[in-house]
């Protein structure tokens, strides 16, 4: 295994600091739409206008959350403005998950995860959006992945946080059914959002989301959404074989996979990484981070997304504000070429599409003084980043 080489990265405190309140999530300026689709009405919040041929940043949240609790604080984070000033932003709420949503009528058939992905086509058509860069968490990451598989020409890039590409096995399915009978929906969702360590140690954060899930999300609608997610199909993606002309079912756009090192989704994200094209995929594992990187490590995630989008050629090379005033940050991002059980299957690539990339393909020469930007934009071979 190659020697680890560190790149310094600023430590950022969590965005969520209120204690014991489920009503503190920041507002996000935007125009709300209720869009009719073949599978029901979807609530959308749109900020800014689509610009020419640029894609729109489109988000999709996890179970137990909505666009407000999953993304608003993150998108209002100062350094995210370095990104969002270049794009319109479209937040999707899964049916019935927005705040104040009424209960569905008795007998309502909630959309499957595949149908949720199909609903996005109607959203893009209604809002006259030509393409997207998707940012999804958990269930939302699955929906965006399915949408990218079905509509590759509409998706230019994906940031997938806590993605699980696999269907639940029979044992997991039975366990989830038993949980519905023996536990309340709030605790079930918390167990999927946070790891055991985080549930015990980060009490303020967990309590914030416990109150939000219990007070702000319609419980009946939430149970339908959770059931739909737990009944998902396997994405059936497979890693292309180098030199083979046999077509494979894989995501064709650049992908940034993100997971906290204590997230319950770590194994699932590594499995997803093993199935994706290594020349288009990057795996970012965040140290000291659980199931909500966008809330706990917004600075690191913002920086990674910025360089990911820069590699696609859409935004200029600008310095993030929190890095411009600190010469010796207290956290580090580590470059790690892995060789473990999954070997090449558990690695990703920082290489971006040649047609859009404005970066150098020179061999990475990393030192402790290099920036994360240099690692992302100059690396021509398969790596994992752990920060």
From Swiss-Prot:
PANTHER family: N-MYC DOWNSTREAM REGULATED. Residues 329-387 are annotated as: Disordered. Gene3D superfamilies: alpha/beta hydrolase (3.40.50.1820). Belongs to the NDRG family. Pfam families: Ndr. This is Protein NDRG3. InterPro entries: AB_hydrolase_fold (IPR029058), NDRG (IPR004142). It comes from the Eukaryota. It comes from Xenopus tropicalis. Residues 359-377 have a biased composition (Low complexity).
